[in-house]
Structures are given as C-alpha cells and as structure tokens.
Amino acid sequence: MVLVFTHPDCALHVTPPGHPERVERLAAVERGLAGIPVERRECPFGDEADVLRCHPVRYLARVKGAVPSEGWAQLDGDTFLSPGSYQAAMRAVGGICAAVDAVVTGEAKTAFVAGRPPGHHAERETAMGFCLFGTVAIGAKRALDHHWLARVAIVDFVVHHGIGTQVLLWDEGRCLFVSSHQMPLYPGSGRPEERGAHGQIVNVPLRAGSGGRAMREVYEGVVFPALAAWEPELLLISAGFDAHADDPLAGLEWQAEDYRWLTDRLCDFAGGRVVSSLEGGYDLEALAASVAVHVGVLEERGR
C-alpha cells in the first residue's frame, strides 16, 4: 500500500485571483486519489533543522518575516506569500521528511506527498516560480544526512526545469539529479552541459510539441541507464503533471497514460523504494487524471 501525506494547512497558501498555483489543485488531487486504496497520514509540521540542510538561516528568517498579516506579499514576479503560506510550506517539508523516514525504515515501499506550495524552483536564498523551500532536495538531504544512505536519486519530470533542486544539490556528490523538461521555457536553465560539481546532474531537454514517444526515447536512452549506473538506495520524484497536453503553462503533449508508464518504470529502481512529491500541474482535470494513474502505480508497486 502507498502512504499518502496531506494536511489541511496546505490549503492556507492562498494565491491572488487568476494565479495558476491555486488551492483548487488540492481538490483535483483528491479526485485523482478517489478509489485508490491508500494509507493516509497527516504531514507533520516541518523541522527547521531540515530546511537548514538546504537553505541558510537568514533566508528562513526572511521568508517568515515577509509573511503578511492579510492579503499578499510578492517575493518575485509570480511567487506570493499569504498569511498561511509559511505554515503550508512547512507542512510540505514535514510531509516529505516523514515520507522519506517511512520508506527508508521499511515501513512502506512507496509514498506520495500532496503538499503545496511546490518546491523545485526555490534556490538557496531565492523564492521563485511559485516555490519557497526546496522540498524534494530537503528530502534527499534528510535521507543522506539523517539516515546515512550512500546514494539517492531524484527524477524531476516537471515541464519546467528544476533549477532550485539543481542549485541546492550542485555540490552534493551522493545525489543523482535527473530532469526532463521542455526547452526553451522558464526558467531557462537545464542544458545538457549543466552537469554538477561531480557530474551527477543529468538534464534532458525536450522540444515543445513532443509527446509520449519522445519521452520514452529519452528515458530509455538516457535516464534509465543513468539510474541503473547510480544504483540509488532511494528514489525521489518531483512529480509535476504540467507536461500534460492540456496544461496551460507549457507545450509538451504527454497524456495520463504516459505518466502511468513512466511511474511504473521508475519503480524498477532503488529496490522499488520511491517517494513522490507533488510539484506542478495546472489544468485541474489533467491533474486529477495524472495523479490517479501515478498514485495508482505507486499503490500497485508498494504492495
């Protein structure tokens, strides 16, 4: 059975009207989860010590200090804080860390964290692209530094490159980071020559308009061999579903069945120990359908 971590506080991050990263995304995720036998757990409130594995204390203090008493505070062109944003982000951090703990200790084989705001664009001292804290990078560092794993891997299939995760783990020789993403597209990073300090970063750009066939080719030809060579003890997934053909923010042509195939193949690595965390996905119906197949596979492979 798959563990699913959620918390009502993740709905406290409220974005301005018309913003694509909106609270209704959580309801879409719940529609996707309907009918799947999952074990639900609440995300604990994150430990600041885990955040500090990736972000300096001055950044943490700056985010907390910027939270408004009402309305919104704007951190960059599309990243906002509302009164409940810090609380929501810390629940997402707590969820990824609790999921890592459960999977690493053998309590479960697979887990999915349905938190928000997303995290893969957040750099060490910069909030950007809807993201405050580098949630999945924090989870990887917990696996490495708290559980003393020797090798972990992250696969990020969000349509936008995970520049934050890349920056946070650029010098981390124990973590393989693999990103497939549309290029050119925001944030403009993710070229193949961006390899990390130890050659442990693999960027696989995809052209606008490409679909499931092109995705399968690059995963079979590049991503899966990299994972096999790395032999990770834990696989984390930055699960953004905005490469779907119906997503309004990009131009890839994936379908829900592509996420089913990809999730199933990713579960072949790390002995099937997989922790997935929600990132993007902004068409609500496409998000629900994609979450349904993604978590459905995690449930099947977690038995």
What residue spans do the PLM features occupy?
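HDAC/HDAC-like amidohydrolase catalytic core signature
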Residues: M1-V155, V159-R303
